[in-house]
Amino acid sequence: MDRMVTLAHKFLAEVVSCGDLALDLTAGGGRDTLFLAQRTGAAGRVFAFDIQKEALDRTRSLLEEQGLRASLLAERGFPRAESGIFLVKDGHERVGSYVRESVKGAIANLGYLPSGDRSIATRTETTLQALAETLPLLAPGGRLAVIAYVAHPGGRKESEAVSALFRDLPSDGWRTMKTEMMNRDASPFLLMAERV
């Protein structure tokens, strides 16, 4: 079976293309940022958020290995409408301080940085705020994918809250779906939303 990240990428690949604006709300190791950068191409823009310098360093290294260059945004503000990959050392809950334009695709891979400090993880309150700021940015047909993990401290509460947010989106403006492994305790699951 495909991993949740692979499914999330397939879901976003259907709508994110060259020249689009896309968001990685949790840069982590950089795989999602790289995927979005490859989809949006040289004419597109990707913003990748993380509070950890280590995560942004890993992301930058992965991008450079693939011949891609990223710029670090040192302070809040709206960069000119130039193309590129922008690494933002700030919480994902402040996405609205950096992005005001229509977004074609966004992804959040919740939890902690793999092989990193497990005490630093996404939190329910900031994740809900990040999603509340991201959803209105999505263009018609735009999509959001969230991979939720329940096994780390606070993960179950966060996962349940994000699931409730997706479930409660009005059906006349959104299509939502949840994909999960049913016979594995505490396995990650994927939440997907599309603006109609």
Question: What positions do the PLM features span?
Answer:
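Conserved beta-strand signature within the Rossmann-like core of class I S-adenosyl-L-methionine
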Residues: 137-148
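Conserved SAM/SAH-binding beta-strand->alpha-helix loop
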Residues: 52
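A short acidic, Gly/Pro-enriched loop at the edge of an enzyme's catalytic core
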Residues: 17, 96-107
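Mobile active-site "lid"/loop adjacent to the S-adenosyl-L-methionine
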Residues: 107-130
